[in-house]
């Protein structure tokens, strides 16, 4: 890891942040002990009250940042309602952070099917058995549901539930933060007016 902070050589000539994120994620994959793709996901409910929780990033390209969930969960309902979200990655071992926010779209059925099929069989059963974010009267009820769906799909493929898919955050802001001495940190923000717009870049006071 460089100790010199963020320099002009860290960025593409096209002012495009996704390549820099890919490099930082690669560094985190080599450095972080657990789940380098873990990210805090922030949403808001219909009253503007925020919620935040950890999810796992499952894809990133120049279209945006992808994760998967139950659309009937709290986060699923809030995203479907507001169509906006924010993320924050923190890699303590690297003394780095990336924040982003933007509009949210649903991934294609083909993308969701492909990722769902790659999951362990038990996780695919869990997508059917868990009524995510709703009250659970006891652990036995969940285990019973798992057993029932395991029996139902004992042979053959397990189809993807219609309420389970992926979201893609299409960012309008991505900020890269690097820790430096005396809290004189480096902060570089990439901004654009719309998810399809051109990026501009600005250095921020720490």
From Swiss-Prot:
One of its GO terms (molecular function) is FMN binding. It is an enzyme of class 1 (oxidoreductase). Pfam families: PNP_phzG_C, PNPOx_N. The keyword Cytoplasm does not apply. Disulfide bonds: none annotated. It catalyses: pyridoxamine 5'-phosphate + O2 + H2O = pyridoxal 5'-phosphate + H2O2 + NH4(+); pyridoxine 5'-phosphate + O2 = pyridoxal 5'-phosphate + H2O2. FMN binds at residues 53-58, 68-69, 75, 97, 132-133, 177, 187. Its EC number is 1.4.3.5. Keywords: Flavoprotein, FMN, Oxidoreductase, Pyridoxine biosynthesis. Its cofactor is FMN. Homodimer. Catalyzes the oxidation of either pyridoxine 5'-phosphate (PNP) or pyridoxamine 5'-phosphate (PMP) into pyridoxal 5'-phosphate (PLP). This is Pyridoxine/pyridoxamine 5'-phosphate oxidase. The lineage of its organism: Bacteria, Pseudomonadati, Pseudomonadota, Alphaproteobacteria, Hyphomicrobiales. The gene is pdxH.
